[in-house]
Swiss-Prot record:
One of its GO terms (molecular function) is DNA-binding transcription activator activity, RNA polymerase II-specific. Residues 186-207 are annotated as: Disordered. Controls the genesis of the spleen. Binds to the DNA sequence 5'-GGCGGTAAGTGG-3'. InterPro entries: HD, HD_metazoa, Homeobox_CS, Homeodomain-like_sf, TLX1/2/3. Pfam families: Homeodomain. The keyword Nucleus applies. It comes from the Eukaryota. The keyword Acetylation applies. This is T-cell leukemia homeobox protein 1.
């Protein structure tokens, strides 16, 4: 394909416009940035954006796609030119210009009446031939300030087709799903053995008046057990029900048995203590009292000494007295 420059596309413009960021930064006056087109061949940075046919309002698809002389990858200026597909936004294509990276951009404005932004039907055409040279580490000002939508000529990622059986999996149920549902239900409803019988509500405790309690205690002191007729008569006299009188006597008998058992145990322990005390006192008295003299031992010194012998006694006077008595008998 023959490379068509911006001046061929727009013959009405006599002089192409070219500018560079280094000229803007280094030139003392603002108008000096517009230099000749010979700066296109300067490969200082290697990154260029060809403006010829780039900023064309109503420039048409052919101008946008072929403005770089390369394969117009993203051309959206109209129904389509010989260099790239049709589109409506910006156009960028890699071209064989001097430098490592050469990006040709064609940004078309609103579509004109002459076939999607053509020069014949557009409001006006602005054409500039030049290179915007930007270092690799500097972002493009135009691309950052005015982001353009991606062109229709971009290579689209093919959509993954839906699996034929995915929609059918929603209706499937697995055993672990059933167990999980059952476990969740048991957590909220409780175990079936717990729900078999509802919990019984505790009845409030019945309170009796002091007069009723006094009459019941008197009757219980006289009679621990009541017959049916006696219980009915007592309940009628105290304005109580038969069940209340029966329950009160049952509880009172239980309390009486417990108190009686405790009292009996206390009496038994006290009797044991008294018995031990009496035995100890009797033993002490038996040790303190002297044994009566045997008439046979009085005449026999040996028997007398054996009778009065007390090995557990430490009193030496008794031993001397025994020896003296034995010597006297001899």
């Amino acid at each position: 394909m023959e490379h068509l420059g911006p001046h061929h596309l727009h013959p009405g413009h006599a002089e192409p416009i070219s500018f560079g960021i280094d000229q803007i930064l280094n030139s003392p006056d603002q108008g000096g940035c517009m230099g000749p087109a010979s700066r296109l061949q300067d490969g200082e940075y290697g990154l260029g954006c060809l403006v010829g046919g780039a900023y064309t309002y109503g420039g048409g698809g052919s101008a946008a796609a072929t403005g770089a002389g390369g394969a117009g990858a993203y051309g959206t200026g109209g129904p389509g030119g010989p260099g790239g597909p049709a589109g409506g936004g910006g156009a960028c294509s890699m071209g064989p210009l001097t430098g490592s990276y050469n990006v040709n951009m064609a940004l078309a404005g609103g579509p004109g009446p002459g076939g999607g932004g053509g020069s014949s039907g557009g409001a006006g055409a602005l054409s500039a031939a030049g290179v915007i040279r930007v270092p690799a580490h500097r972002p493009l000002a135009g691309a950052v300030a005015h982001p353009q939508p991606l062109a229709t000529g971009l290579p689209t990622v093919p959509s993954v087709p839906a699996m034929p059986g995915v929609n059918n999996l929603t209706g499937l149920t697995f055993p672990w799903m059933e167990s999980n549902r059952r476990y969740t239900k048991d957590r909220f409803t409780g175990h079936p053995y717990q729900n078999r019988t509802p919990p019984k509500k505790k009845k409030p405790r019945t309170s009796f008046t002091r007069l009723q309690i006094c009459e019941l205690e008197k009757r219980f002191h006289r009679q621990k057990y009541l017959a049916s007729a006696e219980r009915a008569a007592l309940a009628k006299a105290l304005k109580m029900t038969d069940a209340q009188v029966k329950t009160w006597f049952q509880n009172r008998r239980t309390k009486w048995r417990r108190q009686t058992a405790e009292e009996r145990e206390a009496e038994r322990q006290q009797a044991n203590r008294i018995l031990l005390q009496l035995q100890q006192e009797a033993f002490q008295k038996s040790l303190a009292q002297p044994l009566p003299a045997d008439p046979l031992c009085v005449h026999n010194s040996s028997l007398f000494a054996l009778q009065n012998l007390q090995p557990w006694s430490d009193d030496s006077t008794k031993i001397t007295s025994v020896t003296s008595v034995a010597s006297a008998c001899e």
